[in-house]
């Protein structure tokens, strides 16, 4: 099991470690030998199954080599790479995932495009086009020249979590429990709990997960007041902090299927 490098766990290092530990505990209880490693200490050992939260380029290259040698990898290096925002947006557009429009009257979101967010500055809300242009300049000065832009969508912010092939899917309103990474939830305000079709959301998420190539996933959606929704974020192997024990059971079940 590969831990996620701290740079990819902003404000979430302990939570990310906790989900791996919970999965490891369940696999060990089933009689499996489990080893934990950091992204910085990987060596080729001929493992049968590798569970990885890693995102460093070196880690993905290592996973690719292990996969070519016959190891089963969750999530695959290809899938993890596809979660970089620019690639992800291209896949979403290709398969028709409901996403925010590029233009709107309620502000814009500028997001780092070459990798997952590593700091608060990688995901920025601005109120108008002039502010957007300056935010792009600021991001470029940090060495980031690949980015995505989308219009802000009003509605309930929903965080979702899933494990493909197990039926596991959960969603939560972060403003209900106050758990936050960068406090970006404030731009949508407290949840109104608009009614929407959960099965349709799950179906869209699983369809995207298949297209991206990840089996353990999470993300964010906005539910509008008419019940329609759009996906605004999708990522490989979240911390599952709101449903850790259930998620660990589901991930362990997924591994059993692969054995």
Which stretches of residues belong to each language-model region?
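Conserved anion/nucleotide-ligand pocket segment
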Residues: 108-134, 138
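Short, solvent-exposed loop/turn segments at secondary-structure junctions
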Residues: 56-57, 79-81, 115-116, 154-155, ...
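C-terminal active-site "lid" helix and adjoining low-complexity regulatory extension at the edge
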Residues: 210-214, 223-259
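Conserved N-proximal alpha/beta basic substrate-recognition cap immediately N-terminal to
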Residues: 3, 7-101, 116
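Anionic group-transfer/hydrolysis microenvironments
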Residues: 113, 152-153, 161, 220-222, ...
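Phosphate-binding site of ATP-dependent enzymes
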Residues: 126-212
